[in-house]
UniProtKB/Swiss-Prot annotation:
Entries under SMART domains matching the protein: LisH
Listed Acidic residues bias regions: 21-31
Coiled coil residues, start to end: 197-231, 358-397
GO biological process, one term: intracellular cholesterol transport
GO-annotated cellular components: recycling endosome; trans-Golgi network
Name of the protein described by the UniProt record: RAB11-binding protein RELCH
Keyword Ligase tagged: no
Subunit comment: Interacts with RAB11A (VIA-GTP form). Interacts with RAB11B. Interacts (via the third HEAT repeat) with OSBP (via C-terminus). Found in a complex composed of RELCH, OSBP1 and RAB11A.
Residue list for modification Phosphothreonine: 32, 183
Basic and acidic residues bias (residue ranges): 429-440
InterPro entries: ARM-like (IPR011989), ARM-type_fold (IPR016024), HEAT_type_2 (IPR021133), LisH (IPR006594), RELCH (IPR040362)
Record's compositionally biased regions (Gly residues): 1-13
Length: 1216
């Protein structure tokens, strides 16, 4: 007899040792153990409820002696009741007697015992707790053990023992509480109290408690009625249904009420009010105002419109079907054959001989098919075992795809053979893969065969089968998407599932046992590792055991609990632990099939979608992708897609969203519902715009290539996806006239760049020669540098095509077609040439050429496009379109041409994105010639040089092009036009910063010195910024001296004395390079010459020139004031120069004069501090701090120069 606490269940009180962060409390566990101990009678003396010495309903004398518990409870008065021995038995505790009475439902006896104990002042907690809980009197109670069954005398005997009979002896009905009976929890003890002040309050509390209990009673009763209504079918309908099983199953009362409610709701929503009133009158037994009238604990379904719309998304089957190998019981055939053979030839049985022969033929065919089936299943098992071994030795994550595909192939082959050869089996659908179904009564029967189960094998046949055949009695089929992805692409996509099979534990997890023998072997392998490692850090050792049990257990509730344990095994699983759990989930899914994966595994994911720990949510996101191949296709494209979309939009953890993106990519590899295309596109845009760089990177590596593959199959790559992205870029450029959103531009353009491999694969697959691409003979070689390095395996063209060998054959035919046969009839390539390229070139012309980031992005895009499509395509299709637009010719040079296409971003993008794709000699010559022509045309037309500068900046970032750029500049140095020479001199400034000092010494400085002696003064002036940049970046003493000498000649040569533009350029250069130049050059050359220029400017009589020089001097002094300046230099040059400048600004710019006065005062204070505190030539720490403070103040105030003079007058005043 099972020991059960009153009102409790027998299986729900156990403590699960596998849960790491369960909600069980230590107090609850202790209480459970106390209850268990209290259920044993005489626990202290070894008595058991089932022993002869226990108090049980079968012992009337014992009950009679215990009917008055107020007396001394001695068992010596009834020796016969204790087995008839003359020995005095042990004394029983009152608590043990009370427990036995409650367990056997002797409630009246127990109540009298409780009353007498209260009267004697010895209240028993067990009885007090039991009778104070009204719930104990409202549940349905069955017949107690040993009671109510015919032939057991205990019932009548106890019934006559003082009238203390259990209420259930008269039937198994409810023990309802009556309103007139006061239970102990509702007794008004205030009536018996001397203190009457609290009587009202206590009565109110008791009444509130009574009301709450009454509501709970009503709710429980209605729940019972709801369940009863679900299963209640009128007798006549049941008879009709049994006699005619082809008729639809009759409607249940609960279903009828639910449908009535939904129909009435639909009528009201659509203004069919009169119809609704009539409908309500015809169903007057139902309240249409409240759903609870239908069923209290039944959730309300969506409205009829939603149900109708959602109907097409689900495949409705009448019965639970599972793909199993069909068989016929040999015993039945043997019993059937003689009966058929003995049928006499009558009119009612025509052609008996033919029927008998037909049956015999069918028997023979079934026997042959069964033999063939078992041999194939044995072969499948052997091959899978070999694959598991190879996978454990050689592969890690990618091995999962390998292990799935062969089994699917064998299953589909075997099924197709069964469909062709066996007329006795039924096909459940007419899709591409026809599955053979055998109907079974319960899901558990498909895993634990029973003798009488219709889905189990006959006893005789099971005994004769080889051991492996039993374990493979079910052939599972997973929904294969109607997709055309190459196996290589599929394999690369599945490689993003985070699973592990390259370790001992990983191989155990991926090799789930599916028979009793295998379970034993698994336990033998795993237990030695589990026993010492039950700590939290090693909980993953339990995964094989949990999975095996969950796979084979017949009870759905237990399986659900085990899978719950699996997902909650580790509180915050790390990366390795998550991989192990995922590997186990995939292995579980492969063994149980898509139906159980959907019903058992997916809910575990859904429960943790909003878990507080990101590691748990990460596990959910990763499991959605890992389980995608094993789910029904309707679930893949609906529930799983919605889960991932919710996590992408709502989850705040970057790692979780990254995993979501990878899982979305895997889903996109399996989805085949065209209606989900737009939803996928919206998810793509959301992922590309994610603020996390990790998420964006995962989008380009996984999601975008997988989505592009699906888009290609739907025919939307060239018709929707790429054009939509291009239109978004154009819209950005139109709206960005006053400020371009460069982040969004980068987002869309990078997406286009990631689509280039998919576009090229589409061009190859739809080429006129695609049917000729057969692998035979020697496969041509593909150069390593033929394609740009892909961001991920999914962007590798060979992966998209299927294999590197197939790609090599296609490339050979592709080049031949372009070179000799042209593009006639090649629609996919003509779209690239006639629509994509012109639109791209038009977009390029709208880009702001001064935006370095935009120029760089488009340059990289064209570079990848040209490298992917090949050299022949670039030379024959891309370059001619650019050249047609640019039209580099000196014949039509005029000033208006400066506003043309040469000044736009088309020039740098063509130079850096197209002409640099290939680096053979002829390609380099073409690039040099193009840059020389652009430099010449821009110079001669007096156009802005921004496009040329952008080209030099982009190319100068790569040292491989430094020599080439110097060649272009030398062409300008020796050009006959002074305008071109002047442009070349200015370009040297851009090139010097990135060129190594050897090239500067050998190529740059000689060219600049040549230009510095040019006959044209404008050319000489144009060299000054380049000389200044050399002073700023070069550290070789010899080079610095040469530059210093050249600059000194500009400043000290009498021929330049009146050259206002030269002085302006020198001062501007000094202000730019002075703070970063070598200190000795700054102290000995820059500051003294600025002092001289300030003195000369005092003598200038032209106010416009004086103001121009003064303004540039002010900017130069402002920049140099932040540098360390020695005391001598401060006194002899810096302060005198500032005073000269202030003299000029007093009349020309009073607002500048205020700031200069403050600067002079600060500098004088620094000099005074040095003189007082430190010997000459040194500087104290305090003075240094004052100097730094002055610099900070000055820089903060410099930003206010553009404000009014009145405000500037107060900028540097002391605070009072």
């Amino acid at each position: 007899m099972a020991a059960m606490a009153p009102g409790g269940g027998g299986s729900g009180s156990g403590v699960n040792p596998f849960l790491s962060d369960s909600d069980e409390d230590d107090d609850e566990v202790a209480a459970t153990e106390d209850r268990r101990a209290g259920l044993r009678l005489g626990a202290g003396v070894g008595l058991d409820p089932g022993s002869a010495g226990s108090l049980s309903p079968q012992d009337p004398m014992a009950l009679g002696s215990s009917a008055r518990p107020g007396l001394a409870v001695e068992m010596s008065a009834a020796p016969a009741a204790l087995g008839g021995s003359g020995e005095t038995p042990a004394r029983l505790s009152i608590d043990a007697i009370a427990a036995q009475l409650l367990r056997d439902q002797y409630l009246l006896t127990a109540l009298e015992l409780h009353t007498e104990l209260l009267e004697s002042g010895r209240e028993l907690p067990r009885l007090r707790d039991y009778f104070s809980n009204p719930g104990n009197f409202e549940r349905q109670s069955g017949t107690p053990p040993g009671m109510g069954a015919p032939g057991i005398p205990g019932a009548s005997i106890v019934g006559g023992a003082g009238g203390r009979e259990p209420s259930t002896t008269s039937g198994g009905g409810q023990l309802n509480r009556a309103g007139s009976i006061s239970t102990l929890d509702s007794l008004d003890f205030a009536r018996y109290s001397d203190d009457g002040n609290r009587e009202t309050d206590e009565r109110v509390a008791v009444l509130e408690f009574e009301l709450r209990k009454a509501k709970e009673t009503i709710q429980a009763l209605r729940a019972n009625l709801t369940k009863a209504a679900e299963h209640e079918v009128p007798l006549q309908e049941r008879k009709n249904y049994k006699s005619s099983p082809e008729i639809q199953e009759p409607i249940k009362p609960l279903e009828k009420r639910a449908l009535n409610f939904l129909v009435n709701e639909f009528l009201l929503k659509n203004n069919y009010k009169l119809t609704s009133i009539t409908f309500s009158d015809e169903n007057d037994d139902q309240d249409f105002e409240l759903w609870d009238d239908v069923g209290l604990n039944i959730p309300k379904p969506p409205d009829l419109l939603q149900l109708y719309r959602d109907f097409g998304n689900h495949q409705v089957t009448g019965k639970d079907l599972v793909d199993v190998a069909s068989g016929v019981d040999e015993d039945e055939l043997e019993a059937l054959t003689p009966i058929l053979g003995n049928v006499p030839p009558t009119l009612d049985t025509p052609l008996p001989i033919e029927n008998t022969l037909l049956v015999q033929k069918l028997e023979d065919k079934i026997s042959l098919l069964n033999n063939e089936k078992w041999s194939l299943m044995e072969q499948i098992r052997r091959l899978e075992s070999e694959m598991d071994i190879l996978k454990a030795e050689h592969f890690a994550t990618p091995a999962v795809g390998d292990s799935v595909q062969p089994s699917l192939v064998w299953s589909s082959q075997k099924d197709s053979e069964d469909n062709r050869q066996s007329p006795a089996v039924n096909s459940s659908d007419q899709e591409k893969t026809k599955d053979v179904h055998l109907e079974i009564p319960d899901a558990a029967d498909s895993f634990i065969p029973k003798e009488n189960s219709s889905g189990s094998f006959p006893r005789k046949e099971r005994e004769e089968l080889p051991p492996s055949s039993v374990s493979n009695k079910t052939t599972l089929h997973f929904d294969q998407p109607n997709r055309k992805l190459s196996p290589a692409f599929h394999q690369a996509l599945l490689s993003f599932c985070r699973m592990s099979a390259d370790s001992r534990l990983g191989s155990e997890v991926s090799r789930i046992a599916d028979s009793e023998k295998s379970v034993m072997l698994m336990l033998g392998r795993c237990l030695p590792h589990i026993v010492p490692n039950v700590l939290l850090a090693k909980r993953e050792e339990l995964i094989p055991l949990i999975l095996c049990t969950a796979c084979l257990h017949p009870e759905p509730k237990e399986r659900d609990q085990l899978l719950h344990i699996l997902f909650n095994l580790i509180k915050r699983p790390d990366d390795e632990q998550r991989q192990m759990i995922l590997t186990g989930c995939v292995a579980f899914a492969r063994h149980v099939g898509p139906t159980r994966v959907e019903a058992e595994l997916l809910p575990q994911c859904w429960e943790q979608i909003n878990h507080k720990y990101p590691e748990r949510r990460l596990l959910v996101a990763e499991s959605c992708g890992a389980l995608a191949p094993y789910l029904p296709k309707e679930i893949r494209s609906s529930l799983v897609l919605s889960m991932l979309q919710q996590m992408l939009m709502e989850d705040k953890a970057d790692l979780v969203r990254e995993a979501v993106i990878k899982s979305l990519g895997i889903i996109m590899g399996y989805i085949d519902d065209p209606d989900k295309y737009q939803q996928g596109f919206e998810l793509l845009l959301s992922a590309l715009g994610d603020p996390s760089e990790r998420v964006v990177s995962a989008t380009h590596q996984v999601f975008l290539p997988a989505y592009a593959a699906w888009t290609t199959e739907l025919g939307n790559l060239q018709s929707h996806l790429i054009p939509t992205l291009l239109n978004k870029i154009e819209k950005l450029l139109r709206e960005g006239e006053h400020g371009l959103d460069e982040h969004k531009l980068h987002m869309y353009l990078s997406a286009l760049q990631s689509l280039i491999p998919s576009l090229f694969a589409l061009v190859l697959q739809n080429a006129p020669f695609s049917s000729k691409a057969k692998l035979h003979g020697e496969v041509p070689h593909i150069e390593v540098t033929r394609f740009p390095r892909p961001m991920s395996p999914l962007q590798d063209v060979s992966t998209i095509i299927g294999s590197r060998e197939q790609l090599a054959v296609l490339l050979q035919l592709y080049d031949y077609q372009l070179e000799h046969e042209g593009t006639t009839g090649w629609e996919s390539l003509l779209w690239v040439v006639n629509q994509l390229l012109p639109q791209l070139i038009e977009i390029v012309g709208k880009i702001n050429v001064t935006s370095t980031a935009c120029v760089h992005e488009f340059s990289r895009f064209f570079w990848r496009l040209c490298r992917t499509f090949g050299k022949i395509f670039t030379n024959t299709k891309v370059k001619p379109q650019f050249q047609e637009i640019l039209r580099l010719s000196e014949e039509n040079i005029d000033s208006s041409a400066g506003n043309g296409v040469l000044t736009k971003a088309t020039v740098p993008i063509y130079a850096t994105g197209v002409l640099t794709c290939y680096i053979q000699e002829e390609d380099r010559k073409l690039l040099v010639g193009f840059l020389e022509d652009v430099m010449t045309l821009l110079s001669l037309s007096h156009a802005p040089l921004d496009s040329l500068k952008a080209s030099f900046v982009e190319l100068g970032a790569n040292p491989a092009y430094h020599e080439l750029l110097l060649t272009v500049l030398w062409y300008g140095v020796v050009h006959t036009s002074a305008l071109v020479r002047c442009t070349a001199a200015r370009m040297f400034e851009l090139l010097v910063k990135g060129v190594n000092e050897t090239l500067v010494a050998q190529r740059v400085v000689p060219a600049l010195i040549t230009l510095s002696s040019d006959p044209e003064i404008s050319v000489r002036i144009a060299t000054i910024p380049a000389f200044g940049t050399i002073m700023e970046t070069v550290i070789q003493r010899e080079l610095l001296e040469r530059v210093k000498m050249q600059l000194a000649s500009f400043l000290e040569d009498p021929q330049y004395q009146d050259q206002h533009s030269l002085h302006t350029e020198v001062i501007r250069t000094f202000g730019r390079v002075g703070p970063n130049a070598e200190p000795r050059f700054r102290d000995e050359f820059v500051i003294p010459h600025l002092h001289k220029l300030a003195l000369v400017n005092n003598l200038q009589i032209v106010d416009s020139k004086k103001l121009d020089i003064a303004t540039h001097l002010f900017e130069a002094y402002s920049a140099l004031s932040c540098c360390f300046i020695s005391e001598d230099l401060m006194v002899n040059h810096f302060l005198p120069g500032l005073r000269c400048l202030r003299t000029d600004m007093e009349h020309l710019s009073p607002e500048h004069e205020v700031i200069l006065s403050s600067m002079i005062k600060e500098c004088e204070q620094k000099v005074e501090n040095k003189t007082v505190q430190e010997p000459p030539g040194s500087m104290s720490i305090a003075a240094s701090l004052v100097s730094e403070d002055t610099k900070t103040k000055f820089l903060n105030k410099m930003g206010q120069l553009t404000t009014s003079g009145a405000m500037l007058a107060n900028v540097f005043q002391r605070k009072k």
